[in-house]
Amino acid sequence: ERVKVIVDIPKPDAEQTSVRMEREDGMLVCTGTAGVGNHERSALQTQDLRSCEPKELRILNKLYPGMSLGQYEVFVSADKQIQRFDAGLISDPLECYKDSSLFGGILPAPCTVIEYLWGYPIQAIAPYIEESVGLFGAIEIAFQNGPFFLNQNYQLQSEVICVGQSPQTEYIWYKTIALDASERQIASMIMQGRTMKASSKAYQ
């Protein structure tokens, strides 16, 4: 379905503003924040992410706050992003997603950041989910000492923030950070992953 993103005009001295996504019929899809500088008051940073008791869960009961989801030495290639760009598969394509001369390197589209900062730790989560149907929940991408240039090596580190459940899903919140060769934190992602209870053998 076609959607549009609406960004509130920030006050002159503001570092953050509200954003939302709506369908063409006006139905609200999601809300969040966008900002520069300190992001401690972002939409996700201010969520109450206290964990439930893992023993209350049936699917994610072996995951717990602080549990490592692995460290990964990764070369973040621009090849797939350039292919998507050329095929017209990137919404709102920017030249810096392909042209390295603008900022001294190729910058990632949001989908490329997620491809890496989600794509590796999900390998550690997948054995617990097994054949259950997974859904993306909330996502926050932040750049601390960017840019997060492509065609470079990074170390990704990921760990569980908390686990919990709703009537229809079990969910995990986790954080992944990307460090450059000098061990500076360049980027981070907070992700909520949901698993449908009805799709799991643990609920049958």
What is the predicted role of each segment?
Residues 34-140, 200-204:
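Hot-dog-fold acyl-thioester-processing enzymes
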Residues 1-64, 145-204:
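HotDog/MaoC-like acyl-thioester-processing domains
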